[in-house]
Curated annotation (Swiss-Prot):
Belongs to the PdxS/SNZ family. The active site is at 82 (schiff-base intermediate with d-ribose 5-phosphate). It is an enzyme of class 4 (lyase). PANTHER family: PYRIDOXAL 5'-PHOSPHATE SYNTHASE SUBUNIT SNZ1-RELATED (PTHR31829:SF0). GO terms for molecular function: pyridoxal 5'-phosphate synthase (glutamine hydrolysing) activity. In the presence of PdxT, forms a dodecamer of heterodimers. Keywords: Lyase, Pyridoxal phosphate, Schiff base. It catalyses: aldehydo-D-ribose 5-phosphate + D-glyceraldehyde 3-phosphate + L-glutamine = pyridoxal 5'-phosphate + L-glutamate + phosphate + 3 H2O + H(+). The gene is pdxS. It comes from the Bacteria. This is Pyridoxal 5'-phosphate synthase subunit PdxS.
């Protein structure tokens, strides 16, 4: 029997299993249990949620392996963890710990401003952020098994995630309409690898799932992103920076599943308490915009 562990097909299939669900950032076992009980399909283990990373400034790195192992031991759902863009060793360390997915994340301070990881070299599937089809196709060519919008992490402001989801989906429609002889020029102009564009054109969609991330703070935000075509939702700071994390977690999971049931979403939104404090994007300096990290 052929061993297919870690092949592109297997890794993409693992990511596909999370479709329609919510993945929540957690910093300890207690939060991980709250996420699992609320119905999260996976958790992201890290030292600080994006809002705290943004507030603290400085250099943000991979979480202490003790935190990752604590979370892995507390829940039965898949556990993800973040490494810095281009940091070969952080990725290998996380793989050695046995995490289910690695997020090569712009939320952390990049280790390499030129190269992303060759994700095909790893057995574990990778998640990466994207703002447009060029970024999406490059990450897929490198071996990403799951994509997510970059949005603007830690802001509680959905506007950038909306922009990125609409941009990617509009460009998918454009690629699907191109003639074969036009595809190479489009690849040149966008920096998108030609073979990935051919696959997108053939499928009429990305060949991997694309989740919403970066600014989801309410049940309505989650439902909005699903309506715009997201395959699922990442919630970073929106759960555990809210007034009532357990309530927000359950409500966001329900709203993601029933994203066209407006009466239910209205009911879910009642009595939740305050959502996380938001940040207006225009107030951020260029160097504070995490979405600009990577290429």
């Amino acid at each position: 029997m052929t061993n297919v562990t870690g092949t592109e097909r297997v890794k993409r299939g693992m990511a596909e299993m999370q479709k329609g669900g919510v993945i929540m950032d957690v910093i300890n076992a207690e939060q991980a249990k709250i996420a699992e009980e609320a119905g999260a399909v996976a958790v992201m283990a890290l030292e600080r949620v994006p809002a705290d990373i943004r507030a603290a400034g400085g250099v943000s790195r991979m979480a202490d392996p003790t935190i990752v192992e604590e979370v892995m031991g507390a829940v039965s759902i898949p556990v993800m963890a973040k490494c810095r863009i281009g940091h070969l060793v952080e990725a290998r360390v996380l793989e050695s710990l046995g995490v289910d997915y690695i997020d090569e994340s712009e939320v952390l301070t990049p280790a390499d401003e030129v190269y992303h990881l060759n994700k095909r070299d790893y057995t574990v599937p990778f998640v990466c952020g994207c703002r447009d089809i060029g970024e999406a196709a490059r990450r897929i060519a490198e071996g990403a098994s799951m994509l997510r919008t970059k949005g603007e992490p830690g802001t509680g402001n959905i506007v950038e995630a909306v922009r990125h989801m609409r941009q990617v989906n509009a460009e998918i429609r454009q690629v699907a309409s191109l003639r074969e002889d036009e595809l190479m020029t489009y690849a040149k102009n966008t920096g998108a690898p030609y073979e990935v564009l051919r696959e997108i054109k053939r499928l009429g969609r990305l060949p991997v799932v694309n989740f919403a991330a970066g600014g989801v703070a309410t049940p309505a935000d989650a439902a909005l992103m699903m309506q715009l075509g997201a395959d699922g939702v990442f919630v970073g700071s929106g759960i555990f920076k809210s007034e009532n994390p357990a309530k927000f977690a359950r409500a966001i999971v329900e709203a993601t599943t029933h994203y066209e049931d407006y009466e239910l979403i209205a009911s879910l939104s009642k009595g939740l308490g305050n959502a996380m404090k938001g940040i207006e994007i225009s107030t951020l300096l260029p160097e504070q915009r995490m979405q600009e990290r990577g290429w």
